[in-house]
Amino acid sequence: MVTSKRRSLGRTCLILIFLIVFFAGPAKGGVAKPYKGLSFHIRYATHFRIEYLENGCKLVTDGIGRKLLLTPRGQIPPEGYKQDQVIEIPVRKVVAKWTTIPPLLKVLGVIDSIVGVTIREKEWHIDEIKKGMEKGRIRYLGGSRETDYERLRDINPDVFFAGEWEKQEKLNELGIPFAVVTEYLERNPLARLEWIKFFAAFYNREHEAENFFKKAVKNVKRLSKKLEGLKNRPRILWGFITERETVYMPRVDTYVARMISMAGGHYVFAGPMQTGSAEITLEEFYSWGKDADIYISPGTLPQYGITSIKKLVAIHPILSDFRSIKRGNVWCFQPWYWESIDKTDDIIEDLAAIFHPGLFPGHRYRYFLKLPER
């Protein structure tokens, strides 16, 4: 009986020691080790990485390969890691460079952490951002091309979700932590959406991100099954014509090209497997696109005064011979398109309904606008 009690007491002591060590963590800056128990699989995205360490620490690689060591607030950063910056999490004040960032933070339930943006109030369609700017809680920090670094310093955010063209030396000089976001370089629309996991790491909202992402992937797979066995894939032209009459077309190895394919279309542009956009002449655009069945302009044409196909042709007469123009099959973005990355699955469904309207009777288009002929 005594022996049994001693064994029970011994086990109890061991459990207590384990709990004390596990939850207390290192009192000083120790060496954090990889902790696979908190790992979340990145299935599609290739432009960021997250390594989960012990004691709530994370080593994040941003869009340009910078290493960011995320550590719980009040905890001494662990030793033994090469990092460009240390950022305390969860972050409370952030600045968003791109319109694609706030919708993902909204999904995570942390959109109120945004205190600065680089898009003017009148251009936003997210109520939380518009109201925040109206009340002065969210500040405008200059245009998307040139950030107002003095205002940024005054805000003193926990992290600036920045673009790859930011003046990094200036940010370092001002002591502003930043993480570079390059979701637009991903080769798959689901990879872009998976950047929600990148942002989640800064807020400890991984489970919310994972659950949301799984639902979106499931929706896209359901759509893919609906489009199985298609005999005819319409030829799709996708390109933005500038005032200089040059055209930007997504290259073959881009999320746009794959999104068209996922929606049951055939992208007419060809070339080497490269990312980004190709800048071509209007004449080259004509050769690629004159026989396309559908033309999608990745812009909000009515904002430029182009409210009909007739007005589009009046500005660019070379388009008059396009099959898509003659058939009245010209589409453009709704103003809120770029703020809808969280609706990627719905956007792909919109495209599928444009390409194959017979499969989607009564579909209401939410992210694309069909230009009237006159």
Regions found by a protein language model. Give the residues of each.
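N-terminal hydrophobic or amphipathic helices and topogenic motifs
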Residues: 2, 10, 25-90, 360-374
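Extracytoplasmic ligand-binding site segments that recognize negatively charged/polar headgroups
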Residues: 101, 117-128, 168, 181-198, ...
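His/Asp/Glu-enriched short active-site or ligand-binding loop at hydrolase and phosphoryl-transfer sites
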Residues: 253-277, 296-300
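Basic- and aromatic-lined ligand-binding clefts that recognize polyanionic substrates
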Residues: 93-108, 208-263
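Structured C-terminal subdomain patch of bacterial secreted/periplasmic proteins
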Residues: 186-215, 224, 297-374
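Bacterial N-terminal signal peptides
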Residues: 13-22
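A short, structured surface patch at a secondary-structure boundary
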Residues: 58-155, 159-165
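Short helices/loops that flank or line small-molecule/ion binding pockets
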Residues: 146-156, 280-291
